[in-house]
C-alpha cells in the first residue's frame, strides 16, 4: 500500500480507502498527517469532526492564527474560517474576503471542532451527515494531564456521532486517529489491546496492519523521506541520539526498548499472584521475578478495581522494588505497561 506521495509526505487517501472504521496512524513529526487528512476532507467535500483531547486545544485552534486549516487554505488559495456554534465547539466554513480584509463565512458548514474532554455536553446534537472523525494528537505527550477514563470518553464520542447508522444499513463512521509515537501505553492502545500488535509491527518493520474482523487498521509511518531530511536540521542535530529524536524522526516508542522485556522459561518460576490481566512469578533459585499475561497454577487472585489494586500493592509492593533494581522481567511491553498502570 502506498502511504507517501511523490514528495515523501503522508498521503491519507489509501488509508481511508480500506473502509475500516478505526484507523490509527502513528508517525514522525512534520510528515504531513494532519495536513493530508484536512486537505482530503476539503478536496472531497466530506463532512467531518475534528477532535482534540482538551477544550483548551479546541479553543486555540478556533482562532484564525492557530487554525489547522490555515496552511491548507493557503495551499488551495481559498479562505476557511472558524465560527462558534456553542460554548464547546465551532464550525469551519469557506469564506469570502472583503476589500477591507474581513472574512465572511459562506456556504454550508464544512465540519466541526470538538474536544474529547467536553464532548459529553454535546450528545444531543445531530451528526447524521458526518462521515469522518479526525482525532488529532490522540496520544498525549508525557507532560500532558491525563483525562479520566480517556479511552471510554473516545468510545462514547464515537457512539455519539455514529449513532444507529449501521442498524439503518449505512456505513459506520470512520475514525482517523493521528499522533506521534509519544507513549505506547496510551489509553487507546491499552483499552483496544493493541500494544502487543504495535510492538510486533515495530519488531518486524511492518508498516501497516489491517484487521477486518475487528475493523482496525494500524499504520506506522517509518522510513519517511521527510524524517530523513529533517535529521539534518538544527533541532535534530542538537538532539541526535536522544529519545526525542527517536520519537520524532524514527517513530520509536521508548517502551519497546527496555532491557527488562525478556521472555523467560516459565518452568523455572513459581506463580505468586495474579492481578487484573497479569501474573507475577518468582524464580525458584536466583531471586528474580517475571511478569506475564499467562495465568496458571494457584496464585493469589486480585481484580483491577481500585480496592483490589490497593490490597495487591500493600502485600506485593516488593515487586516495585525488584523492578527498580532490574530484577523484574516482562514477557512483553504490554505486561510492563500494565504493571506500571497498576502500581502507580
Predicted regions and their residues:
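Phosphate/NTP-binding elements of NTP-utilizing enzymes
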Residues: 2-344
Amino acid at each position: 500500500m502506498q502511504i507517501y506521495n511523490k514528495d515523501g509526505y503522508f498521503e491519507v487517501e489509501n488509508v481511508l480507502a480500506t473502509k475500516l472504521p478505526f484507523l490509527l496512524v502513528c508517525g514522525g513529526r512534520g510528515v504531513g498527517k494532519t495536513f493530508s487528512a484536512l486537505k482530503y476532507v476539503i478536496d472531497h467535500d466530506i463532512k467531518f469532526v475534528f477532535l482534540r483531547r482538551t477544550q483548551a486545544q479546541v479553543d486555540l485552534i478556533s482562532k484564525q492564527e492557530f487554525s489547522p486549516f490555515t496552511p491548507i487554505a493557503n495551499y488551495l488559495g481559498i479562505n476557511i474560517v472558524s465560527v462558534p456554534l456553542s460554548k464547546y465547539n465551532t464550525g469551519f466554513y469557506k469564506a469570502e474576503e472583503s476589500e477591507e480584509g474581513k472574512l465572511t463565512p459562506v456556504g454550508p458548514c464544512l465540519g466541526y471542532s470538538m474536544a474529547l474532554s467536553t464532548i459529553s455536553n454535546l450528545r444531543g446534537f445531530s451528526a447524521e451527515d458526518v462521515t469522518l472523525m479526525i482525532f488529532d494528537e490522540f496520544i498525549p505527550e508525557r507532560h500532558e494531564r491525563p483525562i479520566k477514563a480517556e479511552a471510554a470518553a473516545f468510545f462514547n464520542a464515537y457512539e455519539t456521532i455514529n449513532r444507529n447508522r449501521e442498524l439503518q444499513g449505512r456505513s459506520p463512521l470512520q475514525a482517523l486517529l493521528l499522533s506521534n509515537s509519544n507513549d505506547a501505553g496510551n489509553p487507546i492502545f491499552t483499552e483496544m489491546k493493541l500494544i502487543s500488535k504495535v510492538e510486533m509491527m515495530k519488531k518486524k518493520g511492518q508498516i501497516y496492519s489491517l484487521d477486518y474482523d475487528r475493523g482496525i487498521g494500524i499504520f506506522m509511518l517509518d522510513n519517511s523521506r521527510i524524517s530523513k531530511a529533517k535529521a539534518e536540521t538544527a533541532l535534530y542535530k542538537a538532539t541526535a541520539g536522544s529519545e526525542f529524536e527517536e520519537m520524532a524522526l524514527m517513530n520509536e516508542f521508548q517502551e519497546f526498548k527496555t532491557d527488562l522485556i525478556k521472555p523467560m522459561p516459565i518452568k523455572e518460576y513459581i506463580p505468586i499472584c495474579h492481578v487484573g490481566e497479569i501474573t507475577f512469578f518468582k524464580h525458584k533459585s536466583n531471586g528474580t521475578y517475571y511478569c506475564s499475561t499467562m495465568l496458571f497454577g494457584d496464585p493469589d487472585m486480585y481484580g483491577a478495581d481500585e480496592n483490589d489494586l490497593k490490597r495487591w500493592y500493600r502485600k506485593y509492593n516488593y515487586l516495585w522494588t525488584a523492578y527498580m533494581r532490574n530484577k523484574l522481567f516482562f514477557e512483553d511491553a504490554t505486561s510492563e505497561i500494565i504493571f506500571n498502570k497498576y502500581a502507580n
